[in-house]
Amino acid sequence: MRLLILILLSVLVLFQYNFWFGSNGFLDYRQNAEKIKENQAENEKLSQRNQRINAEIQGLTKGFEAIEERARMQHGLVKENEVFYHIVKESK
């Protein structure tokens, strides 16, 4: 009888070890779950960035105002009979 109990206890310990530390065990599961959360957050950020870029592309392809605004801001272009003032803050 003692031998049977010892064998069953050994099997239980083996199963517990595999559950906690074995491949695809609980610790692997927790690590993978954390990686999945990180990847989902990164995917959400990239999806939002893609939406902003897509909206900008749509604005540039369909709207002259967006092209004009971009030319004014990035390249300092002005219209005819228009004066451009660039105010620079003094550095202390």
Curated annotation (Swiss-Prot):
It comes from the Bacteria. Its main location: membrane. Keywords: Cell cycle, Cell division, Cell inner membrane, Cell membrane, Coiled coil, Membrane, Transmembrane, Transmembrane helix. Residues 28-63 form a coiled coil. Residues 1-3 are cytoplasmic. Pfam families: DivIC. The keyword Flavoprotein does not apply. The chain crosses the membrane at residues 4-21. GO terms for cellular component: cell division site; cell septum; plasma membrane. GO terms for biological process: FtsZ-dependent cytokinesis. It is found in: Cell inner membrane. PANTHER family: CELL DIVISION PROTEIN FTSB (PTHR37485:SF1). Part of a complex composed of FtsB, FtsL and FtsQ. Essential cell division protein. May link together the upstream cell division proteins, which are predominantly cytoplasmic, with the downstream cell division proteins, which are predominantly periplasmic. Belongs to the FtsB family. This is Cell division protein FtsB. It comes from Haemophilus influenzae (strain ATCC 51907 / DSM 11121 / KW20 / Rd). The lineage of its organism: Bacteria, Pseudomonadati, Pseudomonadota, Gammaproteobacteria, Pasteurellales.
